[in-house]
Amino acid sequence: MPDIAERYEGYLMDLDGVLWAGQRVFSDAVRVVNSLHSLGKRIVFLTNNSTKSRAQYVEKLRKIGVDWVREQDVVNSGFATAKLLREQRGPLKVYPFGDVGLYVELMLQGHRLVNEDWCWVGDVDAVVVGMDPGVTYWKIGAAANAIRAGADFVATNPDRTFPTERGLMPGAGTMVAALEAASGKKPDLIVGKPYKPIFEIALSVLGIEKSKVLVVGDRLDTDVIGARNVGLDSALVLTGVATLKEVEASQVKPGYILRSLNELLV
Protein backbone atom coordinates (compact mmCIF):
# COMPACT_ATOMS: atom_id res chain seq x y z
CA MET A 1 0.00 0.00 0.00
CA PRO A 2 1.36 3.46 -0.91
CA ASP A 3 2.23 5.81 1.92
CA ILE A 4 -1.19 7.29 2.63
CA ALA A 5 0.26 9.91 4.94
CA GLU A 6 1.95 11.67 2.01
CA ARG A 7 -1.44 12.38 0.40
CA TYR A 8 -3.09 14.25 3.27
CA GLU A 9 -2.21 17.26 5.40
CA GLY A 10 -5.08 17.00 7.89
CA TYR A 11 -6.73 14.15 9.77
CA LEU A 12 -10.05 13.85 11.57
CA MET A 13 -9.08 11.00 13.86
CA ASP A 14 -11.56 8.89 15.83
CA LEU A 15 -10.60 7.65 19.31
CA ASP A 16 -12.73 4.68 20.45
CA GLY A 17 -11.73 1.69 18.35
CA VAL A 18 -8.80 3.53 16.79
CA LEU A 19 -6.50 4.61 19.64
CA TRP A 20 -8.11 2.49 22.34
CA ALA A 21 -10.96 0.15 23.25
CA GLY A 22 -12.12 0.92 26.77
CA GLN A 23 -9.04 0.74 29.00
CA ARG A 24 -6.95 -1.10 26.38
CA VAL A 25 -4.65 1.31 24.55
CA PHE A 26 -3.33 0.53 21.06
CA SER A 27 0.29 1.58 21.57
CA ASP A 28 1.16 1.28 17.87
CA ALA A 29 -1.68 3.66 17.03
CA VAL A 30 -0.32 6.20 19.52
CA ARG A 31 3.07 5.93 17.82
CA VAL A 32 1.45 6.59 14.42
CA VAL A 33 -0.40 9.67 15.68
CA ASN A 34 2.81 11.09 17.13
CA SER A 35 4.67 10.33 13.91
CA LEU A 36 2.04 12.17 11.86
CA HIS A 37 2.33 15.14 14.19
CA SER A 38 6.14 15.14 13.89
CA LEU A 39 5.73 15.19 10.09
CA GLY A 40 3.79 18.44 10.41
CA LYS A 41 0.37 16.94 9.82
CA ARG A 42 -2.63 18.61 11.49
CA ILE A 43 -4.78 16.27 13.59
CA VAL A 44 -8.15 16.91 15.19
CA PHE A 45 -9.47 14.08 17.32
CA LEU A 46 -13.12 13.70 16.33
CA THR A 47 -15.23 11.42 18.50
CA ASN A 48 -18.94 10.80 18.99
CA ASN A 49 -18.31 9.85 22.61
CA SER A 50 -19.81 12.51 24.89
CA THR A 51 -19.02 10.88 28.24
CA LYS A 52 -15.83 12.93 28.69
CA SER A 53 -15.26 16.64 28.26
CA ARG A 54 -12.60 17.88 25.87
CA ALA A 55 -10.34 18.62 28.84
CA GLN A 56 -10.77 15.04 30.05
CA TYR A 57 -9.86 13.73 26.60
CA VAL A 58 -6.72 15.87 26.59
CA GLU A 59 -5.79 14.41 29.97
CA LYS A 60 -6.34 10.85 28.72
CA LEU A 61 -4.43 11.43 25.48
CA ARG A 62 -1.46 12.93 27.30
CA LYS A 63 -1.48 10.04 29.75
CA ILE A 64 -1.08 7.53 26.90
CA GLY A 65 1.73 9.50 25.26
CA VAL A 66 0.12 12.10 22.98
CA ASP A 67 1.92 14.92 24.79
CA TRP A 68 1.35 17.66 22.23
CA VAL A 69 -2.46 17.61 22.24
CA ARG A 70 -4.40 20.73 23.29
CA GLU A 71 -8.08 21.17 24.06
CA GLN A 72 -8.68 22.80 20.67
CA ASP A 73 -7.39 19.60 19.03
CA VAL A 74 -10.43 17.67 20.30
CA VAL A 75 -14.00 17.85 19.01
CA ASN A 76 -16.47 15.51 20.63
CA SER A 77 -20.23 15.31 20.21
CA GLY A 78 -20.94 16.86 23.62
CA PHE A 79 -18.90 19.96 22.82
CA ALA A 80 -20.29 20.19 19.28
CA THR A 81 -23.88 19.89 20.50
CA ALA A 82 -23.46 22.47 23.26
CA LYS A 83 -21.74 24.90 20.88
CA LEU A 84 -24.32 24.47 18.11
CA LEU A 85 -27.28 24.99 20.45
CA ARG A 86 -25.74 28.15 21.88
CA GLU A 87 -25.00 29.57 18.42
CA GLN A 88 -28.44 28.73 17.04
CA ARG A 89 -30.67 29.45 20.03
CA GLY A 90 -28.59 31.04 22.78
CA PRO A 91 -28.26 29.64 26.31
CA LEU A 92 -31.03 27.14 27.06
CA LYS A 93 -32.58 25.31 29.99
CA VAL A 94 -31.29 21.81 29.29
CA TYR A 95 -32.07 18.46 30.84
CA PRO A 96 -28.84 16.51 30.28
CA PHE A 97 -29.31 12.81 29.64
CA GLY A 98 -25.71 11.67 29.70
CA ASP A 99 -22.47 11.49 31.65
CA VAL A 100 -20.41 14.16 33.41
CA GLY A 101 -18.48 15.15 30.28
CA LEU A 102 -21.71 16.23 28.61
CA TYR A 103 -22.71 18.28 31.66
CA VAL A 104 -19.37 20.10 31.59
CA GLU A 105 -19.54 20.99 27.90
CA LEU A 106 -23.13 22.25 28.21
CA MET A 107 -22.23 24.47 31.17
CA LEU A 108 -19.10 25.81 29.44
CA GLN A 109 -21.34 27.03 26.60
CA GLY A 110 -23.58 28.86 29.06
CA HIS A 111 -26.54 26.49 29.18
CA ARG A 112 -28.49 26.08 32.43
CA LEU A 113 -28.78 22.45 33.53
CA VAL A 114 -32.07 21.43 35.14
CA ASN A 115 -33.11 18.28 36.99
CA GLU A 116 -35.94 15.78 36.57
CA ASP A 117 -38.44 17.94 38.47
CA TRP A 118 -38.36 20.48 35.64
CA CYS A 119 -39.20 17.74 33.14
CA TRP A 120 -42.44 16.91 34.91
CA VAL A 121 -43.69 20.51 34.83
CA GLY A 122 -42.76 21.02 31.17
CA ASP A 123 -40.25 23.82 31.76
CA VAL A 124 -37.33 22.54 29.68
CA ASP A 125 -36.01 23.97 26.40
CA ALA A 126 -34.07 20.89 25.30
CA VAL A 127 -33.33 17.32 26.33
CA VAL A 128 -29.75 16.60 25.23
CA VAL A 129 -28.96 12.90 24.99
CA GLY A 130 -25.58 11.20 25.13
CA MET A 131 -24.34 7.87 26.43
CA ASP A 132 -25.56 7.59 30.03
CA PRO A 133 -24.07 4.75 32.12
CA GLY A 134 -26.40 5.73 34.98
CA VAL A 135 -29.63 5.56 32.99
CA THR A 136 -32.74 4.58 34.96
CA TYR A 137 -36.40 3.90 34.27
CA TRP A 138 -37.36 7.18 35.96
CA LYS A 139 -34.79 9.18 34.02
CA ILE A 140 -36.23 7.88 30.73
CA GLY A 141 -39.71 8.77 31.96
CA ALA A 142 -38.76 12.32 32.94
CA ALA A 143 -36.92 13.01 29.68
CA ALA A 144 -39.75 11.56 27.58
CA ASN A 145 -42.29 13.73 29.41
CA ALA A 146 -40.25 16.86 28.72
CA ILE A 147 -40.03 15.95 25.03
CA ARG A 148 -43.78 15.34 24.80
CA ALA A 149 -44.32 18.72 26.48
CA GLY A 150 -42.37 20.48 23.74
CA ALA A 151 -38.69 20.35 24.68
CA ASP A 152 -36.35 19.86 21.72
CA PHE A 153 -35.11 16.27 21.47
CA VAL A 154 -31.39 16.62 20.73
CA ALA A 155 -29.07 13.64 20.23
CA THR A 156 -25.35 14.16 20.59
CA ASN A 157 -24.75 11.13 18.36
CA PRO A 158 -26.49 8.01 17.00
CA ASP A 159 -23.92 5.34 17.98
CA ARG A 160 -25.91 2.37 19.27
CA THR A 161 -22.74 0.71 20.58
CA PHE A 162 -19.12 1.52 21.35
CA PRO A 163 -16.08 -0.77 21.70
CA THR A 164 -14.58 -1.67 25.08
CA GLU A 165 -11.99 -4.20 26.20
CA ARG A 166 -14.92 -6.52 27.06
CA GLY A 167 -16.68 -6.10 23.73
CA LEU A 168 -19.43 -3.80 22.48
CA MET A 169 -21.47 -1.85 25.04
CA PRO A 170 -24.65 0.25 24.60
CA GLY A 171 -23.98 3.75 23.28
CA ALA A 172 -25.91 7.00 22.97
CA GLY A 173 -28.01 5.59 20.15
CA THR A 174 -29.42 3.04 22.56
CA MET A 175 -30.52 5.87 24.88
CA VAL A 176 -31.98 7.76 21.91
CA ALA A 177 -33.95 4.68 20.84
CA ALA A 178 -35.40 4.30 24.35
CA LEU A 179 -36.54 7.93 24.35
CA GLU A 180 -38.01 7.61 20.86
CA ALA A 181 -40.10 4.68 22.10
CA ALA A 182 -41.12 6.43 25.32
CA SER A 183 -41.91 9.84 23.81
CA GLY A 184 -43.23 8.77 20.42
CA LYS A 185 -40.95 11.32 18.76
CA LYS A 186 -37.78 11.30 16.68
CA PRO A 187 -34.85 13.58 17.52
CA ASP A 188 -35.20 17.16 16.30
CA LEU A 189 -31.43 17.34 15.86
CA ILE A 190 -28.57 14.83 15.70
CA VAL A 191 -25.18 16.52 15.85
CA GLY A 192 -22.55 13.75 15.78
CA LYS A 193 -21.19 11.58 13.00
CA PRO A 194 -22.45 10.77 10.34
CA TYR A 195 -24.34 14.06 10.38
CA LYS A 196 -22.85 17.26 9.01
CA PRO A 197 -22.80 19.58 12.06
CA ILE A 198 -19.91 17.90 13.88
CA PHE A 199 -17.86 17.61 10.68
CA GLU A 200 -18.39 21.29 9.88
CA ILE A 201 -17.19 22.26 13.36
CA ALA A 202 -14.17 19.94 13.12
CA LEU A 203 -13.23 21.19 9.65
CA SER A 204 -13.35 24.80 10.85
CA VAL A 205 -10.95 23.85 13.66
CA LEU A 206 -8.69 21.88 11.31
CA GLY A 207 -8.39 24.73 8.81
CA ILE A 208 -7.30 22.60 5.84
CA GLU A 209 -9.02 22.26 2.47
CA LYS A 210 -11.21 19.17 2.12
CA SER A 211 -9.16 17.54 -0.64
CA LYS A 212 -6.24 17.23 1.77
CA VAL A 213 -8.24 15.84 4.73
CA LEU A 214 -8.67 12.17 5.68
CA VAL A 215 -11.31 10.88 8.11
CA VAL A 216 -10.01 7.90 10.12
CA GLY A 217 -12.44 5.77 12.10
CA ASP A 218 -13.68 2.28 12.94
CA ARG A 219 -17.34 2.48 11.89
CA LEU A 220 -19.03 2.35 8.51
CA ASP A 221 -22.26 3.90 9.75
CA THR A 222 -20.71 7.03 11.25
CA ASP A 223 -17.13 7.60 10.10
CA VAL A 224 -17.29 6.39 6.50
CA ILE A 225 -20.82 7.53 5.70
CA GLY A 226 -20.18 10.80 7.50
CA ALA A 227 -17.04 11.45 5.46
CA ARG A 228 -18.97 10.79 2.27
CA ASN A 229 -21.76 13.14 3.39
CA VAL A 230 -19.34 16.07 3.58
CA GLY A 231 -17.12 15.15 0.63
CA LEU A 232 -14.09 13.81 2.51
CA ASP A 233 -11.91 10.75 1.95
CA SER A 234 -12.05 8.05 4.61
CA ALA A 235 -9.96 5.24 6.06
CA LEU A 236 -11.61 2.45 8.04
CA VAL A 237 -9.51 0.83 10.77
CA LEU A 238 -10.42 -2.77 11.64
CA THR A 239 -9.49 -2.46 15.33
CA GLY A 240 -12.92 -1.36 16.52
CA VAL A 241 -16.54 -1.98 15.54
CA ALA A 242 -16.50 -2.76 11.80
CA THR A 243 -15.29 -6.08 10.42
CA LEU A 244 -13.93 -6.90 6.98
CA LYS A 245 -17.03 -9.03 6.33
CA GLU A 246 -19.26 -6.04 7.03
CA VAL A 247 -17.19 -3.86 4.71
CA GLU A 248 -17.46 -6.41 1.91
CA ALA A 249 -21.24 -6.57 2.34
CA SER A 250 -21.71 -2.80 2.52
CA GLN A 251 -22.65 -0.60 -0.42
CA VAL A 252 -20.68 2.23 1.18
CA LYS A 253 -16.94 1.67 0.92
CA PRO A 254 -14.10 3.56 2.59
CA GLY A 255 -11.26 4.86 0.48
CA TYR A 256 -8.85 2.74 2.51
CA ILE A 257 -9.21 -0.33 4.71
CA LEU A 258 -6.52 -0.61 7.38
CA ARG A 259 -5.94 -3.63 9.59
CA SER A 260 -4.46 -1.18 12.09
CA LEU A 261 -3.46 2.47 12.14
CA ASN A 262 0.11 1.36 11.38
CA GLU A 263 -0.83 1.02 7.72
CA LEU A 264 -1.20 4.79 7.40
CA LEU A 265 2.60 4.94 7.38
CA VAL A 266 3.39 1.76 5.44
Model regions and ranges:
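Asp-based, Mg2+/Mn2+-dependent phosphohydrolase catalytic module
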Residues: M1-L15, W20-L39, K52-V75, A82-V266
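Conserved phosphate/oxyanion-binding catalytic-loop motifs
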Residues: N49
